[in-house]
Amino acid sequence: MEVEVGQIVNTHGIKGEVKVKSNSDFTETRFQPGEQLLVKHNNTEIVYTVASYRIHKGFHMLRFEGINNINEIEHLKGDYIYQERDHQDIELGEHEYYYSDIIGCTVFKDDDTPIGRVINIFETGANDVWVVKGEKEYLIPYIEDVVKDIDIETKTIKITPMEGLLD
């Protein structure tokens, strides 16, 4: 199964480098030279092999093998990038999940009151933070004191909110 790992938001320079906004976990592994990525463009799937990878101003900068000119890649602006979900170099530990497993889950308080759906995840130094959209937008830290249960099969998450978390 494939998971979405990013979107090509622009080109960079004239030698065929693309600027990618990642919406995935494990980007340091997924975007390494030699990795294969699938780009879906106009109902066509194109497989590219990463030739180079670097981070520049918060974006992931990629060059693909065989692409040496902006004209060969410019038409992919706005397209999404995918990769096999179960990457051979990624091992999940206990209580670790793929972003794609968490995004879309419905979050409930421990009394079964629905709060909203996880729409985004961002990394902080200490822990991930889930953006949950309900009546308002809430920032839920992925920490043991708050997140009590995650059921990937039913796409549900139970939390015990800290005081002020949902205000």
UniProtKB/Swiss-Prot annotation:
Family: Belongs to the RimM family.
Record Pfam families: PRC_RimM (PF24986), RimM (PF01782)
UniProt keyword annotation of rRNA processing present: yes
Notes concerning its domains: The PRC barrel domain binds ribosomal protein uS19.
Species in which this protein is naturally found: Staphylococcus epidermidis (strain ATCC 12228 / FDA PCI 1200)
One GO term (biological process): ribosomal small subunit biogenesis
HAMAP family on file: Ribosome_mat_RimM
MF GO annotations: ribosome binding
Start and end residues of each PRC barrel domain: 94-165
Subcellular location field: Cytoplasm
Any one GO CC term of the record: cytoplasm
Name the record gives this protein: Ribosome maturation factor RimM
PANTHER family: RIBOSOME MATURATION FACTOR RIMM
InterPro entries membership: PRC_barrel-like_sf, PRC_RimM, RimM, RimM_N, RimM_N_sf, Transl_B-barrel_sf
Keywords: Chaperone, Cytoplasm, Ribosome biogenesis, rRNA processing
Assembly description: Binds ribosomal protein uS19.
NCBIfam families: 16S_RimM
Task of the protein: An accessory protein needed during the final step in the assembly of 30S ribosomal subunit, possibly for assembly of the head region. Essential for efficient processing of 16S rRNA. May be needed both before and after RbfA during the maturation of 16S rRNA. It has affinity for free ribosomal 30S subunits but not for 70S ribosomes.
